[in-house]
């Protein structure tokens, strides 16, 4: 039931004070004026509280249970982050206030930028992008600006591996590049010979995730970087999987020129359901002049915004990023420290490999090498034997109170699950997950229809996902309309 269906004429939740603002007689154009009052639901405060409390109880979250969503790093978000981000000094300021009264916020963002540069091995960084894909687009615009500044107008191609995130080719295309797909080698990694075939004087950039989306570290990354640079192209780092290498190595040390980070993954800020996220973009020195405006600078112990950058790609959004998310990431990094962040990477890899070995006794691992933070498993054999698909297993997991792993991605593996346990899960949780998974496989063999018709315990069972995607209903339809 929606909030509109609870509406009853005359019910009120809050009485607004009388309007004492003088009418200055602004003459707005007719096309900007509302023709009729908004159709707001008329409900009591108790109705509202019960409605949204019940909806919240139906949600699944990291605070509820295991959330092994591959390539998403659904780690626990420490509550100290929330506590400090809610301090009045952060929540009651506005971006339009003069810098004299926002020095604390500016200092926090400046220091966060410096810390992220150190963690990633970059020379400069912007915190403005609102999400990972927004960071990707920003990085691609920087790559384009770099080549155009050199008069290198032929470079219109972006190489993207076939195992890459779907946002990689989308971001490259939005920036005006032609996307060229690079086929993975038999081991799931970049094949240097195959890469050489695609590199020429029309290639602007190669986009990579390392570890890649199969959870495998690109062992030839130094050679890859040298090869890309030899041909005059740039190397771009998708930071989705940075969690695995924290404190061990840095994208900048591998030879990457541009990197975007996902604060809502690696640095424990909440994510899911569309945001808010944060996708800072770091660059090496030769690309710093192209970073978007404004940039945060420090002059004589005063923090301020600098808009005077003649070769900048310009504005990429209003104001300066999702500030409250930046506060949470700052708190996380300060709390963990260098040793703590290194331990994060170690435990993420340890948990993933422990779970990989356990799951390998239930279904095949697509690439059986030691993984980093995640791995890809396939139930293709079970599907051929019983007709039970990865989607069915994912739905059945919901009945056992576990969020399904990422399914059918990467696209180069059939009937697959991409599983990322993160560093914050205990051995007990991982053992319980494998017990449940094993039980579902037994169910699939003994009673396939049971699994094919799951879930049974969720408020909504199987959605018509195709219709929801192609014909979304984004507003309430009143009967008289």
Swiss-Prot record:
Its cofactor is pyridoxal 5'-phosphate. One of its GO terms (biological process) is glycine decarboxylation via glycine cleavage system. The keyword Oxidoreductase applies. Belongs to the GcvP family. C-terminal subunit subfamily. The glycine cleavage system is composed of four proteins: P, T, L and H. In this organism, the P 'protein' is a heterodimer of two subunits. The glycine cleavage system catalyzes the degradation of glycine. The P protein binds the alpha-amino group of glycine through its pyridoxal phosphate cofactor; CO(2) is released and the remaining methylamine moiety is then transferred to the lipoamide cofactor of the H protein. This is Probable glycine dehydrogenase (decarboxylating) subunit 2. It comes from Thermosipho melanesiensis (strain DSM 12029 / CIP 104789 / BI429).
